[in-house]
Every structure is written in structure tokens, then in C-alpha cells.
Amino acid sequence: MDYESIKKILFHFDPETAHHIAESAFELASFFPFILNRLQEKFLVKDPMLSQELFGKTFCNPLGIAAGFDKNATMTKTLHALGFGYVEIGTVTPKPQSGNPKPRLFRYIKQEAIQNAMGFNNDGAEVIKARLQRITPASFPIGVNIGKNKTTPDEQALQDYRFLIKTFHSLSDYLVINISSPNTPGLRDLQNESFIKELFSMAKELTNTPVLLKIAPDMSEDQAVSLCSTAVDAGAAGVIATNTSIDYSLLRGAKDFGGVSGKVIKEKSFAIFKAVAKELFGKTVLISVGGIDSAEEAYRRIRHGATLLQIYTSFIYGGPGLVKSINEGLIEYLKKDGFTHISEAIGIDIR
């Protein structure tokens, strides 16, 4: 059965139920190596032109699944088999939490967008750590996206991040500090220079595992550049730009809560990424996410300084076929422009 047929069935359900159905299927598939092998043969693009060594691991292609899809590390192996060069799990919090009241996930099919107000629902660090112990070390890179519990006051947030770094640094190829989700009250207030300086200075003392910062698109370009520069100066190994947006003017019929993602945030996300890349390209690893839905868009981000890319919403609408077509399309763009390896194209438009 092709993905369009599967999607028609899944889209009969509300988005969160559909996600749980997919999660159950993906989790089941992960226990059967022959299924994973078949999926890999069909969807996973492994080409020397796209392969990169980063963070001490080989990324067979630059496209990863963004955090929020595999919140609990239940689908990690299957997502790699479906074509992703790496998988970022989470967001994980120290204690389990159920997230915000339902309904909290909404599709906007004609606009190929999603709005979510999930609120870091996850099984908690202990359970997710045990799952990762069963699948690591993996043959592909795994990132862990970490966030504070909703009940943790901002002035104690540092302790949550300390605990999470100590818990996951040996089970991940990189860690991501999430202070940019709009769905935990007060979390975005931590996107300030003094907290970021303190956080990354602490991280540097705790681990050699690369720790990255993920930022929101809802700030000025100057502010984004300043925050990211502060993080890199304090020891951040990279920047992920961007998270979902709370600019509801981008989406027709938007709710007045939660974060918007998909095609509608493409230009907003790209503008912030471009500003950060102009300042930090060559100084740190830059990962672009937000509205990437084609090889053409992926290539634009790469030419503007992205070493790696992530998708989420476009995967919901396009399925694993999209992952494959983006990676194969990137190879074609590289060849057309006379490049023999992705590294030659990264940042070519801003050098």
C-alpha cells in the first residue's frame, strides 16, 4: 500500500490518534530486522556525496527527523530505515508529564501545516534512558532533545538541564537544549543571554558530548544572532533554527495557542536561519528546520550554511517517499552545480 492510501486512512482519525497508530506500527516494525532491511532498501539514501562526519559519527545523509515526532524513543530504528540520516528524539523532561489538555494537535491540510500545543508530553528520563540503552550504540546518529518540566520554576530550570545532560550524554551523539517551545509557560523567557551563558558553561563542564541550542523564529534577526553567538561563545556545538512559530497570521483559521509548523513558516524560519548563518557559518554546526518540503528548499538551506536539515510536518504530509526524494534531489542539484560532495555546497551563497 502506498503512502497516499495510508494517509487517507490515518487522516480519518484526529491527529493525535493517527500519530499513536503510526507509532505502534513503527515500534512493532523495529523488532523485525527483515522489515527494517526492506524499508532501508526502499527509502534510505546512502551516497558518498551526502555522507558527512560530524560529532564523531557518520551521517549517511543530511536529513533528520525533528524532535517531537519520536518523543519517547519508540520509533528510532524504524525512522532511520524510512530514510532519515539521523533521528532526534524528545523532547525529554526529567519526570514524565502528560502535556497540555486535549485537543492539542491540529491539521490544516490545504495549507500543509500543523498546529501543536502538546506541552512536552513524554515518558520521562528514566523510561526513555532504558529504551536508548537497548538501541545504542546505533549504526546511525541519535540526538536527544531535552527540556524542563512544566512544574519546574524558571529559577530551577538549570537543575533540570543538568540532570538531563548527565542522564543522556553517554547515550546520544548530540544533545539539544530546548528553550524555544511555545507550549511550556515561561520556557521562551529562558532565551536570554545570561541563562544561555550559564547553561552552556555548565554543559561544557559536565560532558564532551556536543550540546546544541534550538531557537524560536519569533524574535528579531539581531536577537537571534546575539543569542546564538552567546551560546557558541559559551561552548554550544551548534544551532538548530527554528522551532515552531506563534505568528498566527501565517495560518488561515489558526487557533490562538500552540506552535505553527509546515509550509507556512518556510520564509520566516529561513530568514532567521539565514541571519544566524551569516554570522556563525564556519564557526559552528548549523541545522536548518522549518518548512522544508522539497529538495529545492533543502538545497537552498544548504547553500546558505546548513550542514544538516530536519523535517517534521512535511513528513506527515509526504511520507517516507518525500525523505527519499529530498535526498536524491540533493544529489542531482549537487551534480548540476558541479559539486562532488555536499561540503562544497554548504554556505556557498554566504561565503
Swiss-Prot record:
Cofactor note: Binds 1 FMN per subunit.
Record GO biological process: 'de novo' pyrimidine nucleobase biosynthetic process; 'de novo' UMP biosynthetic process
Topological category with respect to the lipid bilayer: Peripheral membrane protein
Positions with a binding annotation for FMN: A67, G68, F69, D70, K71, T91, N145, N178, K214, T242, G262, G291, Y312, T313
Binding site for substrate: K71, N116, A117, M118, G119, F120, N178, N183, N243, T244
InterPro entries: Aldolase_TIM, DHO_dehydrogenase, Dihydroorotate_DH_1_2, Dihydroorotate_DH_2, Dihydroorotate_DH_cat, Dihydroorotate_DH_CS
Active site: S181 (nucleophile)
Keywords assigned by UniProt, alphabetized: Cell membrane, Flavoprotein, FMN, Membrane, Oxidoreductase, Pyrimidine biosynthesis
EC number, UniProt record: 1.3.5.2
Cellular compartment(s): Cell membrane
HAMAP family: DHO_dh_type2
NCBIfam families, sorted: PRK05286.1-2, PRK05286.2-2, PRK05286.2-5, pyrD_sub2
Subunit note: Monomer.
Name under which the protein is recorded: Dihydroorotate dehydrogenase (quinone)
Organism whose genome encodes this protein: Nitratiruptor sp. (strain SB155-2)
